[in-house]
Amino acid sequence: MAKQSMKARDVKRAKLAEKFFTKRVELKAVISDVNASDEERWNAVLKLQTLPRDSSPSRQRNRCRQTGRPHAFLRKFGLSRIKVREAAMRGEIPGLKKASW
């Protein structure tokens, strides 16, 4: 089980990333625009650096919805491998069954 503070930190990062998403996209568009002047591009870089660090989507961590486990996360289910296996064994995931050959 992950600490509550770690889960809360990820929730905070998700909210910040959502809040600054449009501003971040606009600044990155200016930075990658070849037709923009060097000064405009440099100012966009400086503005991007002033945004909160946690507003970057790459700072978010995928976590299991039930346990908060950060490793062995399966995106399709939103759970860790352990919880997916437990749910599959109980028959809670439609269409998923144990492999046998």
UniProtKB/Swiss-Prot annotation:
Protein family (similarity comment): Belongs to the universal ribosomal protein uS14 family.
Listed name of the protein: Small ribosomal subunit protein uS14
GO cellular component: cytoplasm; small ribosomal subunit
GO terms classed as biological process: translation
Coiled coil start-end: none
Gene (name only): rpsN
Annotated function: Binds 16S rRNA, required for the assembly of 30S particles and may also be responsible for determining the conformation of the 16S rRNA at the A site.
Keyword Ribonucleoprotein: yes
Subunit structure: Part of the 30S ribosomal subunit. Contacts proteins S3 and S10.
Pfam family membership, one: Ribosomal_S14
GO molecular function: rRNA binding; structural constituent of ribosome
Domain of life: Bacteria
Keywords: Ribonucleoprotein, Ribosomal protein, RNA-binding, rRNA-binding
